[in-house]
Amino acid sequence: ENSTLTLEDTEKILSGGTLARNVNVREVFEAKKLATLTESLLEKNNSALNIKRILALHKTLLTNIDEPIAGRFRTGKEWVRVGNHLGSNPQFVPALIQELVDHYNQHKSLYFLDAVAHFHAEFETIHPFVDGNGRMGRVLINLQLMHLGLPPIIIQNKSKHTEYYPLFTQYQSTMKFGGFTELFALLLQESLHKRITILTAKKIIPLSKWALQKGVKPNIAANKAKRQTIPAFRMREKWMIDEAYSPSN
């Protein structure tokens, strides 16, 4: 979040390469830590969601980056503000997160994406940490999905300001989280389409090329991809699809 690193920069860092430009050392550490955190989810995705695990994940995220605040909630006078939103009073943060975790674990009859969406909206509204709230919130989404046997989702950087951040303003003024449910449903479909296509497609091509081959207007193809009415998905933030896919399939 708020990083100047490009996708290509991040890939070079994680593969041990050297960047051709100077970057903030903290951002390099943050990229590596987030990768480590993601790997840990793959190894331990059956663990239940609880306070201990949330704090352990946060500690992994910020160790060697900001040790004094790693692995603990805000306390004392550690107030945080994001735009016009003021995070919850530090005095009540531990209790608020415990209530949120209990609500998530106890309401098993709730539609699973509604449960994940509500948890995420409320977690970010509380903003329990001094730093790393956005990254932690998105990590927890994937922890919850993977615990249900589903693949992780990616909230694309390019569309955050138009499709993701406005949903928080809506939630904080109305307490309605349906927008998050709808967004996560689309991203989950995209994640599944991506995995199925990678495993089954003979050739994967850009959506723009596919549209040209099939005689579909590019803007119509793009809209279908965004609505997930065709099995398109993003790689390096570019829409892709199985070359053999036909709209009549």
Report residues per predicted region.
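FIC/Doc superfamily catalytic core
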Residues: 1-131, 135-249
